[in-house]
Each structure stands twice: as structure tokens, then as C-alpha cells.
């Protein structure tokens, strides 16, 4: 029997000053115990934000509850990268195992609810938010040499892909500038760590680079791409800016 792998999205609030470790029982003590011990901190005292403390758990959501009807909880799920809508009411997460972009309603952060998912044409590596859209990078590479990927523009309200922007390589991370005018995508073109010829060490081509998207106006069809060459900058492996 396949061993199920569970993932959970943890919703936390923050109060300044010291962080206190959570010692109270949680609904998923057991398979989530390690995650909670490592990542969930809870400030001492009440949960109304009046007492000093740090991060504290106010809710969590098991990603298996956001599977499609009829799908088995034995399916492996991953909640890896999370971004929030600009109104703070929706969380968008990447699930690389299922190749999905999931949505969770945190209007009541103590009682999060799944809102479904968008099935993607590749493995999601990162997600960020610009206005009404989630910007999700996906890896569509055939192998470590023949690399490819796309930036998917997803309408958050309708959960639909409204534009696909080819990136020319395997993307890693995505970030939107604070003024909302640019999106930067790191094209990693990661190395094969099991490559016998190199022992998994760099340099391994193709080289990585940076893609900048000019977020012109509110219509994603007007957005444009620029590529920035990053070779020759680093002292170590300058030909391979992975």
C-alpha cells in the first residue's frame, strides 16, 4: 500500500517581541507533529493580540481536503510556496506533486476553507501576486539540458489561466516589485546532482538568467518580457549562474 504523504497550510498571526513555542495539542497531532514542532510558534497568553509574544497558530488547513471529488487521500500533496491575495482573504499555494495551484479562503483565518485548484501544464516552482492575478512559474523541462518553463497568469477570482508567457528555461523563484510595476523570475536551469560526468557539481550548462516582466497596466496581454544575462558576474562558476 502506498504510504500517504500529507501537507498542511498553517495560518499564523504575529505579535511583536519574543516567540514562544506552542505546547498545546493540535487537530493533526501525529503526522503533522514534526511540522508543528519545527515551524509553528505560538505566543503565551490569550490569542486576542493583547499579550506580548511572537508568531502563533490561529488555524491550519490540510491540503488533502482540497483534492478533487473522488481523489484518494493516499495521493502525495505538497504545499510549498504560498502567496496572499492583495486583500489578504485568499491564500494561493503551489502543489508540485499534483502540478496544481490551490486556493484557500482565510476570510476567517481560524477556519480556513479550500476553494479548489487550477490544474497546471507543468510543475509549479513559485507563485506571487500582482493585483487580481497570481503569477505562477512552472517547469516544463524535458531534462536538465533541454530546459523550458512558463509564467502563468492566473485570474484569482475565476481561477483561470488568462495568459501563458514562455520563459525559455527552468524557473525557480518569482517576485513582484513593491510598486507593482515589475515581476522578476529567476531562471535557475538547475544542475543534475546525479550527473556522473561532473559528480553533480557545477558548472553545468545551460546557464541561468533573469527574466523581468513589465507589468504594463491591468491587462496581462500588454505585459512584456525582458531577459538579463547573468554570466560573468560571480567569481565562482561565472559561466553557470544557477
Regions of interest found by a model, annotated:
Residues 108-141, 167-171:
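Blade-loop segments of beta-propeller domains
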Residues 137-147, 186-208:
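Short, conserved, GDST-rich strand-edge loop motifs in beta-rich repeat architectures
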Residues 148-159, 200-218:
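Beta-propeller blade signature
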Residues 59-102:
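Beta-strand-rich domains and repeat architectures in extracellular enzymes and scaffolds
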Residues 71-82, 124, 171, 200, ...:
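Signature of short aromatic-glycine-proline-rich micro-motifs recurring in repeat-based ectodomains
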Residues 86-88, 129-131, 176-180:
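Residue-level detector of Asp-centered blade-edge/turn motifs that repeat once per structural unit
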Residues 51-73, 119-120, 217-242:
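Surface-exposed loop and turn segments in beta-propeller and other repeat-based domains
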Amino acid at each position: 500500500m502506498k504510504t500517504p504523504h500529507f501537507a498542511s497550510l498553517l495560518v499564523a498571526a504575529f505579535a511583536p517581541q519574543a516567540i514562544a513555542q506552542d505546547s498545546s495539542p493540535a487537530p493533526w497531532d501525529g503526522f503533522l507533529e514534526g511540522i508543528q514542532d519545527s515551524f509553528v510558534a505560538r505566543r503565551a497568553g490569550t490569542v486576542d493580540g493583547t499579550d506580548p509574544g511572537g508568531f502563533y497558530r490561529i488555524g491550519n488547513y490540510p491540503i488533502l481536503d482540497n483534492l478533487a471529488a473522488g481523489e484518494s487521500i493516499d495521493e502525495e500533496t505538497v504545499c510549498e510556496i504560498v502567496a496572499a491575495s492583495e486583500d489578504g482573504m485568499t491564500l494561493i499555494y503551489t502543489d508540485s506533486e499534483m502540478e496544481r495551484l490551490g486556493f484557500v479562503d482565510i476570510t476567517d483565518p481560524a477556519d480556513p476553507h479550500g476553494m479548489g485548484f487550477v490544474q497546471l501544464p507543468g510543475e509549479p516552482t513559485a507563485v506571487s501576486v500582482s493585483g487580481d492575478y497570481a503569477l505562477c512559474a512552472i517547469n516544463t523541462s524535458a531534462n536538465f539540458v533541454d530546459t523550458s518553463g512558463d509564467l502563468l497568469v492566473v485570474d484569482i477570482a475565476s481561477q483561470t489561466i488568462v495568459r501563458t508567457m514562455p520563459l525559455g528555461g527552468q524557473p525557480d523563484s518569482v517576485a513582484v516589485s513593491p510598486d507593482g510595476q515589475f515581476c522578476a523570475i529567476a531562471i535557475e536551469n538547475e544542475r543534475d546532482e546525479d550527473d556522473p560526468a561532473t559528480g553533480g557539481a557545477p558548472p553545468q550548462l545551460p546557464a541561468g538568467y533573469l527574466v523581468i516582466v513589465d507589468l504594463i497596466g491591468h491587462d496581462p496581454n500588454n505585459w512584456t518580457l525582458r531577459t538579463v544575462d547573468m554570466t560573468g558576474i560571480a567569481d565562482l562558476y561565472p559561466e553557470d549562474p544557477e
